[in-house]
Amino acid sequence: MEQFHGTTIVSVRRGDKVALGGDGQVTLGNIVMKGGARKVRRIYNNQVLVGFAGGTADAFSLLDRFEAKLEKHQGNLTRAAVELAKDWRTDRMLRRLEAMLITADATTTLVITGNGDVLDPEGGICAIGSGGAYAQAAARALAENTDMSPREIVEKSLEIAGDMCIYTNHNRIIETIE
């Protein structure tokens, strides 16, 4: 059975501000199944932002597990991500999940990959999903050459990705921590 997939999630950190945004398109093969999905959320008492890309059911499974790790480690983002990655590498069921997460709190942004890796993005900019490369390139150019806020950079990056990637639409949800 073919999986639901296709999205763009991008995060930009500048100083003490971070924005995380994503589009709303859910695709099954070459059919748009939903245009207004919410793939970016606030969790852990609104202190942590998370965005997910990949198979929808897999992403929700990982999100649930990540929230449990955050609770267990009292909101310590890095510790929760590393513990999730350890589980991901050792649990046979988790190893088959095809999804990625970007997580951010007031001080840290992390990418949790489908291989169970935890990455701290260079320059505070990262993106995942089918339109991730477009969004990340746009965000990097905007961050290096403008005074735009993280939210504005995320918005424009998602717009550019939506113009270029057939699996990304212009329904955007953006969350910030300032």
Curated annotation (Swiss-Prot):
GO cellular component: HslUV protease complex; proteasome core complex
Keyword field: Allosteric enzyme, Cytoplasm, Hydrolase, Metal-binding, Protease, Sodium, Threonine protease
Family: Belongs to the peptidase T1B family. HslV subfamily.
Top enzyme category: hydrolase
Catalytic activity: ATP-dependent cleavage of peptide bonds with broad specificity
GO molecular function: metal ion binding; threonine-type endopeptidase activity
Summary of subunit composition and partner proteins: A double ring-shaped homohexamer of HslV is capped on each side by a ring-shaped HslU homohexamer. The assembly of the HslU/HslV complex is dependent on binding of ATP.
Ways its activity is controlled: Allosterically activated by HslU binding.
Designated name of the protein: ATP-dependent protease subunit HslV
Gene3D superfamilies cross-referenced by the UniProt entry: Glutamine Phosphoribosylpyrophosphate, subunit 1, domain 1 (3.60.20.10)
Purpose of the protein: Protease subunit of a proteasome-like degradation complex believed to be a general protein degrading machinery.
Highest classification ranks of the organism: Bacteria, Pseudomonadati, Pseudomonadota, Betaproteobacteria, Burkholderiales
Record-linked InterPro entries: ATP-dep_Prtase_HsIV_su, Ntn_hydrolases_N, Proteasome_sua/b, Proteasome_suB-type
Catalytic residues, chain numbering: T7
E.C. no: 3.4.25.2
GO biological process per UniProt: proteolysis involved in protein catabolic process
Binding site for Na(+): G162, C165, T168
Compartmental location: Cytoplasm
HAMAP family in alphabetical order: HslV
Annotated organism of origin: Burkholderia vietnamiensis (strain G4 / LMG 22486)
Presence of keyword Metal-binding: yes
